[in-house]
């Protein structure tokens, strides 16, 4: 590099003499591109973030120095690097933050202004992403006082070129401008706000390496606070060299100072450097892979970076999932060390005498934080580890765990070993933590954050940081589990009754809610193992409950819930809930009301904890309907199917009589519909159909009617017409082109050869919908599309989401017999545009009759179920089933 710089200097000198401006720009641009290429090659040959930062910073310094000299900026001015460039941490495509510091004057002269504009223009011509400000010393101080971000940026400064004297004045002024208490308050609040922006979790599918909780910005915040404290300490020191050390480039001297001052240990620093390096490597690879400043670890680049780092897809775990686990474990550690260091620095600054309140013989509340009376308590008595979390639940005045206690927890968590887990006292305390009336969610989250939960439950420890790239889950397995538990806790709070009134009412009367929390902890604990995670988790749960002394019936309930935790959502979203046989079968499965209530509460909490996109009012209504129907079936001893049909006929007749419709007018309609019709449709639908169709029993043209769904989100659409083979395909095409998705389709054929189909459609865009004129549009336009004189349109091929493109999900097709002449077709696939329309087309091409369809979208994944047979209830042969399955697989 030094030889290249000297050659560059000679070449520039000759070009300047000749006045060749364009050649000068090309020379610097080539120097930059060649240097950047060499830095990249060296990095990929031997990945070392520190070396890359050093070389990249030197390269840019050289270019800026020549540019500064070329533009003949005032000799009393200085070019100062600030921010990431100032601290010498320059990633491949990071912006260059520059401060052009001018001597005090009333205004920048016209000549100076021209030279500065020339400099900035030159830097842009060179392809550098520059963010610059031009200020005098007094303007710097004014901005720093008004804006904490500006002040922070100015603290991380370095003289690139120009006047050293004015730079020294700048350092002195910045040091004096820092009001340490205010700085700490604002920076901690800034971090809290940043955490809130990312929903207080680092464990998202596409985290921001720089800004997400536990990311590089957490390390920066630690160093900003340390630098501010060190600068303030230096400003009180008579030795001017001490102040220069405080402003020194990079963080090495800051870490050293923390160790000298006994604020951080060498072991802690070693771990910090390890995890910092992981994040820096990922961000560097991300910049190179994206060819721009990209800080989000998006799907587009996860696989490529995982392959570069040597991760392989094995045993059902994607390489990208392994990469993300490494990332999540690093940010988990950084979050903890961030908490330890900030608490330590705040404690260091405090001059107030401690306020101490004794709780018991082992613990105090010191300045609102829990503290042990003896520093060696946890080492000598590991059982007290659980007391830390139990006491925070029992004493709401405690704001958190003191830094000393937090540090001790990190040191002793290795004592949560086999002997600890086998202790009857510790088992009792763990169940006691789960049984507290308040603070269960906070306690378990803290136990997970500090590594205690995974040590006590090794099977939980294995899923910490484990991501699932399945187009459905958006959190790591451990984060999802704790989200489910948090949702259960929300049911316990009367002030949140408005969210889920039924859940709150059921939860308030449920004995032993800690059993629900245990089921939540175990329901996905076997994810990532070979085999069915529900069955494996059930075994773990039963063993855990037995070893913790729970009564047999309680342990069996927890284990049953874990094994059955997908059953209620699957039934609600894949089966026809108006079919009494479905309800009867599900009632026999759950057996009693206690199980039903527990499974309902767990299911709602589980779906809500999976992804913000998955839960909606439609799913809420399905689950609530299944709960109510099943509860009714359990409460009645008579055969539920017979009872349901009789009740529906009676209630529909009463409803129709209120509008003056007598039984004699719709008897023929009901007779032609057949007895099975009353198993497929509910009272409200029967009365709706009867009112509209009684005059049109033998309609010659399609009848389409639409209304707002009386039971929840969406629009309910009824289609009545003579049976035709492409009917379902035409309907799917129509709604697909409207950007509506079908939530449910009830397909029924009357005894006189008419199709009576009812659809629930939902807005696919997530936007608010104006229903003014929409219902009439559907009635008119869909009727036109069903006219046989028009040709069947091909399904649309719209834009797929990035996740669907970049996270391959193998479609799963399952066809199985459910009755003598009926099969169920289950499809799990990426929710690509036009998916349902394509499936409908395939069913038509294979002469398949459809009786019912339940369409379920879970994030970017579709889970669809269809009841099918051959034409006119002809049973499908094995050959036809194979052909149908192959056709769907080929299309998906």
For each predicted feature, which ranges?
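Divalent metal-dependent catalytic cores for phosphoryl transfer on phosphate-bearing substrates
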Residues: 88-115, 260, 476, 504-636
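Conserved catalytic core of two-metal-ion nucleotidyltransferases
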Residues: 57-65, 71, 110-165, 281, ...
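Regulatory modules associated with amino-acid/nitrogen control
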Residues: 278, 311, 317-321, 325-370, ...
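Alpha-helical phosphate/pyrophosphate-handling elements in metalloenzyme active cores
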Residues: 58-80, 225-261, 474-516, 536, ...
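N-terminal regions immediately upstream of nucleotidyltransferase
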Residues: 1-75, 93, 200
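Conserved nucleotidyltransferase catalytic core and NTase-mimicking acidic/glycine-rich helix/loop elements
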Residues: 39, 178-349, 512
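Active-site flanking loop/helix segments enriched in acidic
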Residues: 43-56, 201-211, 370-374, 426-432, ...
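Active-site nucleotide-donor binding segment shared across nucleotidyl transfer reactions
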Residues: 51, 61-109, 113
